[in-house]
Regions:
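Helix-to-beta-strand junctions that scaffold the AdoMet/dcAdoMet cofactor pocket
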Residues: 33
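A beta-strand edge to alpha-helix "cap/lid" segment located at domain peripheries
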Residues: 2-27, 37-138
Length: 138
């Protein structure tokens, strides 16, 4: 089961990258639970798949328009066979718009964040129950 689950989770991560790179908010939210929780890099919290998708429409048409996304899985921990924590480092590349001052990122440099995904397996599918993202300053 673990090897299968590892591959399925890696596939979910690959799907997130591909959806970001296409600026496809619907696909980016596809495996986000209907009642999932999203905390963005500003510390704002939102509930539900529809809101997660709506927020990413803003992301893909705003300051991160045209960017590319890299995700590096640092650690995958199974809390139970059907619950996993995925600790990732993200990099947003190709930023061409000035970021708010809260980000200490020179124009053109990648934005780095730490992302914790809480994943729940239901009906043979891994779902994102929690998406908690924090800005890395260095």
């Amino acid at each position: 089961m673990a090897a299968t689950s590892n591959q399925e989770i890696n596939d979910l991560i690959s799907d997130l990258i591909a959806a970001w790179d296409r600026a496809d908010a619907k696909a980016f939210a596809r495996q986000f639970q209907k009642d999932g929780t999203f905390t963005n890099i500003f510390g704002q919290t939102f509930e539900g798949q529809e809101e997660f998708e709506r927020r990413h429409v803003d992301v893909f048409t705003g300051i991160f328009k045209g960017t590319k996304f890299e995700l590096e899985l640092l650690k995958l921990k199974y809390v139970r066979p059907d619950v996993a924590l995925a600790d990732l480092e993200t990099r947003v590349l190709g930023i061409t718009k000035k970021l708010p001052p809260v980000f200490q990122v020179p124009l053109g440099a990648p934005l780095r964040t730490r992302l914790l995904l809480v994943l729940v397996r239901e009906s043979d599918t891994w779902w994102i129950a929690g998406y908690h993202n924090v800005d890395l300053k260095s």
